A protein has these predicted regions:
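Charged, low-complexity intrinsically disordered terminal segments
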Residues: 1-387
């Protein structure tokens, strides 16, 4: 299938959305014939990821916003070192601030000395000395590709919070979309000054033997970067809200929406769509709880239902709509994800996946309280934009 064409079975209703994303960049391709597992437990991701790493024969590509020097990070690190000793190519692209500030440099030097290539995301096209650019524009993607056969992406970084403490959503994927995720990694690696041992075809996807009925998911990558004139992910949220008929349920840990997104939320409710936002009651980042709530009043006045989830911190970034389309990704509903960071998300055009996602959302609702009062400090909007 041509990169810019849509498969015959693509749902007519969502063709304008898919084409809109393709116009934004050919990396936002549609892939047919995929299979996936929705992961909502860090322990489940740990189990699957470690097993897939153990099976690796050719290469392991990882890019993370956070790769911890803790129980989770060291467990994965030790296995990566083992695979490197076996001759597997192992590459880790880490967000620059995490690389420089969060972990002692010896941690990464030891990995590199023992065969794991580790470099910070620097985006060399803007110059290695552009300190401000590197600080302000972060690699927020969470991607693993193993042997071109299996990939992971979503909201989970790699440290103890994500494996053992928080509630998050991630995907394990097989099928043609793995090629797109690997291409994204390879471009970021090269942009950061990294090299490859072999020509690109060596890292091409390898077919996976699997029953045909399991590989029926239509998926589209949605990639964002500060170099683009507009945010593809913001377009996705607004398009779905503007065209929804029944419901749109959204989970995000951070909520600092531009006015255009607030307008789309309000417009959907005005048409009779059931719009719900789920956010954490307690946020992991100072001031962000208050900043989130600075937007509640506008949403509540429009009729959007806001649910704050107690218990463990919910870091999930998902959308489900009309039992037809869903999103799982790394992007928050905030200015930084839309306009400043390097992000990647998956758009899934599939009824079974969306219904499953809706059931997960409703299950999470059991630990929420609905917000009725939105009279919070609006000045926090200005504070956030200064960060």
């Amino acid at each position: 299938m041509n990169k810019s064409t849509l498969p015959d079975q693509f749902p007519e209703r969502y063709r304008p959305l898919a084409r809109l994303l393709l116009q934004a960049g050919e990396e936002n391709r549609v892939y047919e014939g995929n299979s996936l597992e929705i992961i909502t437990s860090g322990l489940r991701k740990r189990e699957l990821l470690l097993e897939d790493i153990r099976r690796a024969k050719s290469f392991i590509h990882m890019e993370y916003y956070r790769f911890g020097n803790d129980r989770a990070g060291r467990e994965v690190r030790d296995l990566l070192l083992q695979k490197a000793a076996e001759g597997v190519e192992v590459r880790l692209l880490n967000n620059n601030l995490s690389y420089w500030l969060s972990i002692p440099s010896k941690y990464y030097r030891d990995m590199t000395r023992k065969g794991v290539e580790v470099i910070p995301f620097t985006h060399i096209r803007h110059g290695l000395g552009t300190w401000l650019y590197r600080i302000n524009h972060q690699l927020h993607r969470k991607v693993v590709v193993i042997d071109g056969q299996v990939a992971y992406t979503g909201g989970m970084n790699l440290n103890d919070n994500y494996f053992y403490k928080w509630r998050d959503t991630h995907l394990r994927i097989t099928g043609p979309i793995v090629e797109g995720l690997n291409a994204s990694f390879m471009q970021s690696w090269k942009d950061s000054g990294g090299r490859f041992c072999y020509p690109p075809e060596h890292y091409a996807p390898v077919p996976v033997a699997q029953e045909a009925p399991l590989r029926d998911k239509l998926m589209q990558l949605v990639s964002d970067s500060p170099e683009k004139p507009s945010s593809a992910m913001l377009e996705v949220y607004q398009w779905i809200l503007d065209h929804a008929r029944d419901y749109v349920y959204i989970q995000t840990p951070y909520f600092v929406p531009p006015q255009s997104l607030l307008d789309s939320l309000a417009g959907a409710v005005k048409r009779g769509v059931d719009v719900r936002l789920m956010l954490p009651h307690k946020v992991d980042t100072p001031f962000m709880g208050t900043t989130n709530r600075a937007y509640y009043q506008d949403c509540l006045k429009a009729g959007v239902r806001i649910l704050e989830r107690g218990g463990e911190f919910i870091h999930s970034k998902t959308l489900v709509a009309d039992d037809e389309v869903s999103v799982v990704g790394a992007s928050n509903l905030d200015w930084r994800s839309f306009f400043l960071n390097y992000e990647i998300n998956t758009l899934i055009y599939d009824r079974e996946t969306t219904v499953n996602g809706k059931e997960i959302f409703l299950s999470d609702t059991m630990q929420t309280q609905e917000v009725k009062n939105g009279s919070w400090c609006r000045f926090m909007r200005l504070f956030y934009r200064m960060l």
